[in-house]
């Protein structure tokens, strides 16, 4: 199971730190993922979901 949002597909991306002199170094930007149990089509599933997705769960999906 990868660290990717089950609903939105958000995952870790790479970005740059920028200093005042505009030097750049690589860094990692991670989404706010929570491990949650959901009830989907009568089945219990444990999935990674972003905090934003948990605010607006799709129809037919219930958090347990």
Curated annotation (Swiss-Prot):
Gene3D superfamilies in UniProt: Ribosomal protein L28/L24
Gene Ontology CC: ribonucleoprotein complex; ribosome
SUPFAM superfamilies: L28p-like
Pfam families, A to Z: Ribosomal_L28
GO terms of molecular function: structural constituent of ribosome
NCBIfam families: L28
Descriptive protein name: Large ribosomal subunit protein bL28
């Amino acid at each position: 199971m990868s660290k990717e949002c089950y609903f939105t597909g958000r995952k870790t991306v790479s970005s740059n730190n920028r200093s005042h002199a505009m030097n750049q170094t690589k860094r990692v930007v991670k989404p706010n993922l929570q491990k949650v149990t959901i009830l989907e089509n009568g089945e219990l599933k444990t999935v990674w979901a972003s905090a934003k997705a948990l605010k607006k769960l799709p129809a037919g999906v219930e958090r347990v």
